[in-house]
């Protein structure tokens, strides 16, 4: 299974990617995780990426394409992979096609998880993370026992810069302008599947697995 996950930030792509990864025994490749790791470790790539991420902008193509090419060329991707956060532009999608051609493989499908903007804003701006251990919470859906205090280590809960409402709105605007055209791109190639992700996680998972069961591998 070689799969691209599409959908606005906060649509639940990462959650569903874990399920799909376990079901099809292929690695989940999140460009967001790669960038966050580099930012945390203070690498040159991390410093460059942080400038864009903090403003709610996309990391430039040339920074992203090389990372993805290297990752999907690894032995554990021979049987497939799930790309989460890439491609985000038509140019990146075209570059991905070139990379796959070089590897003599094809993309099986692009799965689009659709969630309305209002729900995305509610989900993302309500996120909180522990400043000590990194555990995730939500002020509506997953509250700590004591407000703003981590259940596990008593660390202070903070809102990441890219989860602030004004940044979320900027990220959505960027998504609609630059990433949404990918839906049409993959639809024209006959690779697009769309599921609705505004219900609970379990309902979305059922819809995702049902949609993927019809993909010819």
Curated annotation (Swiss-Prot):
One of its GO terms (cellular component) is cytoplasm. It catalyses: AMP + ATP = 2 ADP. GO terms for molecular function: adenylate kinase activity; ATP binding; zinc ion binding. CDD domains: ADK (cd01428). Zn(2+) binds at residues 130, 133, 150, 153. Its EC number is 2.7.4.3. It is an enzyme of class 2 (transferase). Pathway: Purine metabolism; AMP biosynthesis via salvage pathway; AMP from ADP: step 1/1. It is found in: Cytoplasm. Pfam families: ADK (PF00406), ADK_lid (PF05191). Residues 126-163 are annotated as: LID. Keywords: ATP-binding, Cytoplasm, Kinase, Metal-binding, Nucleotide biosynthesis, Nucleotide-binding, Transferase, Zinc. It comes from the Bacteria. GO terms for biological process: AMP salvage. AMP binds at residues 31, 36, 57-59, 85-88, 92, 160, 171. Residues 30-59 are annotated as: NMP. ATP binds at residues 10-15, 127, 136-137, 199. InterPro entries: Adenyl_kin_sub (IPR006259), Adenylat/UMP-CMP_kin (IPR000850), Adenylat_kinase_CS (IPR033690), Adenylate_kinase_lid-dom (IPR007862), P-loop_NTPase (IPR027417). Monomer. Belongs to the adenylate kinase family. PANTHER family: NUCLEOTIDE KINASE (PTHR23359). Catalyzes the reversible transfer of the terminal phosphate group between ATP and AMP. Plays an important role in cellular energy homeostasis and in adenine nucleotide metabolism. This is Adenylate kinase. It comes from Acetivibrio thermocellus (strain ATCC 27405 / DSM 1237 / JCM 9322 / NBRC 103400 / NCIMB 10682 / NRRL B-4536 / VPI 7372) (Clostridium thermocellum).
């Amino acid at each position: 299974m070689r799969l691209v996950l599409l959908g606005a930030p906060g649509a639940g792509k990462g959650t569903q990617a874990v399920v799909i990864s376990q079901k099809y025994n292929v690695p989940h490749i999140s460009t967001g995780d790669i960038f966050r790791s580099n930012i945390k470790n203070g690498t040159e790539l991390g410093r460059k990426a942080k400038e864009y991420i903090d403003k709610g902008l996309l990391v430039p193509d040339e920074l992203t394409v090389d990372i993805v090419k290297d990752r999907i060329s690894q032995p554990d991707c021979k049987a497939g992979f799930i790309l989460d956060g890439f491609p985000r532009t038509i140019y990146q999608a075209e570059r991905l096609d070139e990379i796959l051609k070089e590897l003599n493989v094809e993309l099986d499908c692009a799965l689009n998880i659709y969630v309305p903007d209002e729900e995305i804003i509610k989900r993302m701006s309500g996120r909180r993370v522990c400043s000590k251990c990194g555990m995730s919470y939500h002020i509506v859906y997953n509250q700590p026992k004591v407000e703003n205090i981590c259940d596990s280590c008593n660390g202070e809960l903070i809102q990441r810069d890219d989860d602030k409402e004004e940044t979320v709105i900027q990220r959505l605007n960027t998504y609609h302008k630059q990433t949404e055209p990918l839906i049409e791109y993959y639809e024209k190639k006959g690779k697009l599947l769309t599921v609705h992700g505004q219900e609970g996680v379990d309902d979305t998972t059922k819809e995702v697995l049902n949609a993927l069961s019809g993909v010819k591998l």
